[in-house]
Amino acid sequence: MKVYSIGLFKVVPGNKPVLLNIVYELSSFGFFQRGSVKEVSLFVSRETVGRTNVGERVSMEHTQTQKVCHTTVDSKGLGCSVLTDSEYPGRVAHTLIRICLEEFYKVHPESEWRGLQSDVELQTPALDQLLLKYQNPETADPMMNLQKNLDETITIVKKTVEQLGQRGEKLDDLAAKSDDLSFQSKAFMNNAERMNKCCGYV
């Protein structure tokens, strides 16, 4: 999973978005490829953010580049794009966008960029740090780590149930022998199984 660039733009509907700042992480590309990759990244980011409506969160896959451009534009016309590979989680990319917008406003009030008509480079030191931090979404985003732990737990439970079946034991047989289940619970399980079979035939 990779984040290739973070871009900030002034977006006015009907006009070409004005670049305010963009940072790149292109270490996975060869030295001679990086210039072209930067140009393509800027092009994809600008085109996608320019087609994003105010308040929308967009994740657009670009088949030619095999990248996903995640964008949003806030009510003041400040747009942010995060260009990632296709494996990068969209929710984490949009969390990164929100943080980038906040960091940009801390150092560049709206009055500083609102009147700009051509591309500039308004330095925002936090963008470089965020670009590096979010290369690993699991460590950067606590929810991602929680989701990973939950997925691992579900996998363990599935494996445990599959292993029971591999030993030739059916869950029904184990339930029938169990002292943990009352007569009513055993009857409920049998009834539920019959109902599921019945529904399966419909």
From Swiss-Prot:
InterPro entries: Longin-like_dom_sf, Longin_dom, V_SNARE_CC. The modification Cysteine methyl ester is found at C199. Pfam families: Synaptobrevin. It is found in: Cytoplasm, Cytosol; Cytoplasmic vesicle membrane; Golgi apparatus membrane; Cytoplasmic vesicle, Phagosome membrane. One of its GO terms (molecular function) is SNAP receptor activity. Its main location: cytoplasm. A lipid is attached at C198 (S-palmitoyl cysteine). This is Putative synaptobrevin homolog YKT6. It comes from Dictyostelium discoideum (Social amoeba).
